[in-house]
Amino acid sequence: MNEKYDPAAIESAAHAQWVAADAYRVDENARDSQGQLKPKFYACSMLPYPSGKLHMGHVRNYTINDMLTRQLRMKGMNVLMPMGWDAFGLPAENAALKNSVPPEKWTRENIATMKGQMLAMGLAIDWSREVATCDPTYYKWNQWLFLKMLEAGIAERRTQVVNWDPVDQTVLANEQVIDGRGWRSGALVEKREIPGYYLNIVKYADELLGAVANPEDPNYLSGWPERVRLMQENWIGKSEGVRFAFPHQIAGADGELIQGGKLYVFTTRADTIMGVTFCAVAPEHPLAAHAAATNPALAAFIAECAHGGTTEAELATQEKKGLPTGLFVTHPLTGAQVEVWVGNYVLMSYGDGAVMGVPAHDERDFAFAKKYGISIRQVVQAEGQTFSLDGWADWYGDKQRAVCVNSGLLDGLPYKEAVSKVAELVGAQGLGEKKTTWRLRDWGISRQRYWGTPIPIIHCDDCGSVPVPEKDLPVVLPIDCVPDGSGNPLKKRTDFLNVACPCCGKPAQRETDTMDTFVDSSWYFMRYCDARNSEQMVAGGTDYWMPMDQYIGGIEHAILHLLYARFWTKVMRDLGLVKVNEPFTKLLTQGMVLNHIYSRRTDKGGIEYFWPHEVENVFDAGGKVTGAKLKSDGSAVDYGGIGTMSKSKNNGVDPQDLINQYGADTARLFVMFASPPEQTLEWNDAGVEGAHRFLKRVWGFGVKQAELLKGATEVGAELSGDAKALRREVHLVLRQVSYDYERMQYNTVVSGSMKLLNALEAYKHDGSAGSAAVLREGYSVLLRGLYPACPHITHHLWSELGYAAKLGDLLDAPWPEVVEAALVQDEIELVLQVNGKTRGSIKVPAAADKAAIEAAAAASAEVAKFADGKPIRKLIVVPGRLVNVVV
């Protein structure tokens, strides 16, 4: 063996051996040495977007997965760790626009680069199952299932209000609208109502909610972080209340009553119905449009609202504005006339696009009424409180403590009883009923983008929107388009666009919208189970592997991706494609990787960021960083604290640079040791150096003791006291490390390995066979415990030192068992105190009773020394810990 630890040579040789053996390919028929089927375990990281290069967040995520996979394989399980590419999406279009290349080319090059980096990391990935969502063989099944959803009524075509960029001629996501303007063009964004396809996720809302909110639910996701369950519960947002109508006699231009003469609202606070002093409708509401036809000021206001946000989050932060319409509706219980306003805070997509205004008991309505001089009427009262129009108080909206007042038939009723009474009263008039609503909205999947799954629909003037026949799937996306910023290039591709109608044969056109990329990531984990099946979307492999046992990914995916994947699984179940109710049994959301941020203002008012290696920190007297200066010229820069690694802030670390300098094992070891997986990891160059030094020590011990380790026998009964002590330490560490693997607390797995190496290095070999045997056993435990984190160096040492000859390749070597007999001590050491102060220690037989311990303490030299001739008054024994001699 080479005395010097050479990561590049070691890792290259290990890779070659694993590739030649196809070491990570798994199937559904794996059996143990007795011919029994191995239990399965499916561990998967969220598939990455092929952005160009891996970042340290990727390294951390995949190393967590790899450690889990390798250790469970050693424990005899059939473990699947697949990988793929979330390859469609807007970033590829933007890169293509910038570089004048097709997104396909940019994407494939990035996949090749990132796959090479993953190989260099030594990940135990079954690459035979690799998928890329931009492959027609993959997205064919997006299209196929979409057609099945159409047949089942789960998918349907309807209109939607979207953010429209009039310059780029495309729909923008809400996060792409900055201060009302398109993020790229700078144009004022418009709200437009355009047709698109929606998936009825709300149909599954109760089931989706139960598994995250109700521990009694048979599908309750107890293996998920509570934080994620709560985020999904809030996003689904179940509300129970009353939907009722304000009748009116407002007729449209056609002479018919608008919306049948009923303005419907939904409220969870029907107990406050007697406090209604106005109603507000969305700018797109039919009553708003009717009033605006003869009111130029209102028409201008509605046009202004068209440049606002389209989400609840945006509306919550913007200034609340409104204008009266001059229209009135009738209060369903009092018969009073209630004025209708147009409010910029009302969403047409939420409920009926209208809300009742109760300023006395809703904080938003209170501010709106004060701003516009609308009357405020108190209708609930909490005991001991005083209502005032001067300002809002939290109790005004408290439904738990208050009872109805100034409300006629409702007076004195608490919240629940009042709501039931209102539902009864409006129901008797045929104007309403109790209803459950959801914050969750049906999933609009249409995107006016090129780089995505084509929606398999053909539009015919005679036949309407016609599904593409299954035999013609996939509808293949042209891969040579180069976006030029003038809208969806598919609209210009006549070879794609023009097609015969499947029904009548007349000229027709394909749908040019593509699917939301969340569609791609909603079922890829099932495709891994049967990735090469050209005849079926999923088959037997899915029955074997699903549900996934462990899913690993960032908290940023807690809502949309995970919710959509759960929904997609339930749809596939209902269509008879899979048998599971929930896709992911356990979820780990790993923490972000953080690093220091340094910057300063430029002469032009911009911000210039500096790499951490370019600066030197300035500390205060307490050792706290107060600033920094450039190493090159000593000029001051601002220290921005710790933040997420980012290319834009020059505080990222290129994993490839780390691998080139230290090797993949060092990179893996550091990201596992520096922090528990679910917590943030603060980057530390000194920590990387420390991890590398530790691996050099592991290597050095193996080299130094090579001959002894190769020639040692199995541990027998004849061991010296020191050998027994070392063996006990080995098995204590093994017990703790095994437990830490079960908990996925990989940082303490590494610290346990460090503790074990310290013990092995400190041990003085006495030349006996027993001593050598304990060293050999201890080092084998070290290599196996460390192997999932650092597979290359441990693989090499395992083979070179003869372990593989007896126990097989480290990939499938058995996980070591704790020998309980080794934990039994012949002798124990107790802390010795005199009058409560520690003065030394004593050793006594492990089986010593209280009298024997007291005798040993009384006879010790330390007691004689510190008692100073005084007689012993009392001895206090704390079993297994200490003895206190009171003089």
UniProtKB/Swiss-Prot annotation:
It holds the Pfam family Anticodon_1. Keywords: Aminoacyl-tRNA synthetase, ATP-binding, Cytoplasm, Ligase, Nucleotide-binding, Protein biosynthesis. GO terms for biological process: leucyl-tRNA aminoacylation. InterPro entries: aa-tRNA-synth_I_CS, aa-tRNA-synth_Ia, Leu-tRNA-ligase, Leu_tRNA-synth_edit, M/V/L/I-tRNA-synth_anticd-bd, Rossmann-like_a/b/a_fold, tRNAsynth_Ia_anticodon-bd, Val/Leu/Ile-tRNA-synth_edit. The lineage of its organism: Bacteria, Pseudomonadati, Pseudomonadota, Betaproteobacteria, Burkholderiales. This is Leucine--tRNA ligase. Its EC number is 6.1.1.4. It catalyses: tRNA(Leu) + L-leucine + ATP = L-leucyl-tRNA(Leu) + AMP + diphosphate. A motif ('KMSKS' region) lies at residues 644-648. CDD domains: Anticodon_Ia_Leu_BEm. A motif ('HIGH' region) lies at residues 48-58. PANTHER family: LEUCINE--TRNA LIGASE, MITOCHONDRIAL, LEUCYL-TRNA SYNTHETASE. SUPFAM superfamilies: Anticodon-binding domain of a subclass of class I aminoacyl-tRNA synthetases, Nucleotidylyl transferase, ValRS/IleRS/LeuRS editing domain. ATP binds at residue 647. The keyword ATP-binding applies.
